[in-house]
Amino acid sequence: MYQNNLIDFNPYSCLSAVEVGKHLYWKIGSLQLHGQVFIVSWLVIAALLTISFLGTRNLQRIPEKFQNFMEFILEFLQDIAKNQIGEHEYRPWVPYIATLFLFILGCNWAGALIPWKLIHLPEGELAAPTNDINTTVALSLLTSLAYFYAGLSKKGLGYFARYVQPTPVLLPINILEDFTKPLSLSFRLFGNVLADELVVSVFTLLIPILIPLPVMILGLFASSIQALIFSTLSAAYIGEAMEGHGEE
């Protein structure tokens, strides 16, 4: 009875509903996939590809308007890779770091800006793909594979000597570090994105007339920071794996 009265009183109550742990499952053989994650991810990827195409289809020697903005983004992402990986080794890793940053930023902003709850699904709800732990773990494992590849490609099997440096006593700690890196990356991103959506939903429920725009704006800022942290740490791990090979 109380909930019904609250829903009638709050015109935005549909936006404050939160379903945690419910998913739209797609079955492929014996596999069960979280369909809502794929739907929003595909939309984000399509939006990024469209923006990239529009910004680069008519390149000018003197950039104007949209091209100028795209070049600013590219220089910003190049600086992240250069500062963390090193001036001599960063270029091959710019596409990976840029893809991480833009995809995470797009997913976070899609969850913060688009009222997905107005779209009803048979089960679960559309939301930012990064509020699904499977997405953040997958991104973190990609970074783990990337820095293992970076270290092995530069040092060969000598890369594994780092586990017993400066003393073999640190072997268990160095091995544990390889597990804690993806764990910290994935849970930090997942926790912050999920917490932001929950806070916005609670404020929307408590404030019956106005959607809490200041909280949403703060969420956009926090989402951008999380994308920056994830991509910067990924670049730092790659640079650490190649340490000692940045100088010629």
Swiss-Prot record:
Keyword 4Fe-4S belongs to the record: no
The keyword Ribosomal protein is annotated on this UniProt entry: no
Keywords tagged on the record: ATP synthesis, CF(0), Chloroplast, Hydrogen ion transport, Ion transport, Membrane, Plastid, Thylakoid, Transmembrane, Transmembrane helix, Transport
CDD domains, A to Z: ATP-synt_Fo_a_6
InterPro entries membership: ATP_syn_F0_a_bact/chloroplast, ATP_synth_F0_asu, ATP_synth_F0_asu_AS, F0_ATP_A_sf
Pfam families: ATP-synt_A
UniProt GO cellular component terms: chloroplast thylakoid membrane; plasma membrane; proton-transporting ATP synthase complex
SUPFAM superfamilies named in the record: F1F0 ATP synthase subunit A
Membrane topology: Multi-pass membrane protein
Any one GO MF annotation of this record: proton-transporting ATP synthase activity, rotational mechanism
Segments passing through the bilayer: 35-55, 94-114, 133-153, 202-222, 224-244
Cell compartment(s), UniProt: Plastid, Chloroplast thylakoid membrane
HAMAP family: ATP_synth_a_bact
UniProt family annotation: Belongs to the ATPase A chain family.
Subunit structure: F-type ATPases have 2 components, CF(1) - the catalytic core - and CF(0) - the membrane proton channel. CF(1) has five subunits: alpha(3), beta(3), gamma(1), delta(1), epsilon(1). CF(0) has four main subunits: a, b, b' and c.
General function of this protein: Key component of the proton channel; it plays a direct role in the translocation of protons across the membrane.
Name of this protein: ATP synthase subunit a, chloroplastic
Source organism: Porphyra purpurea (Red seaweed)
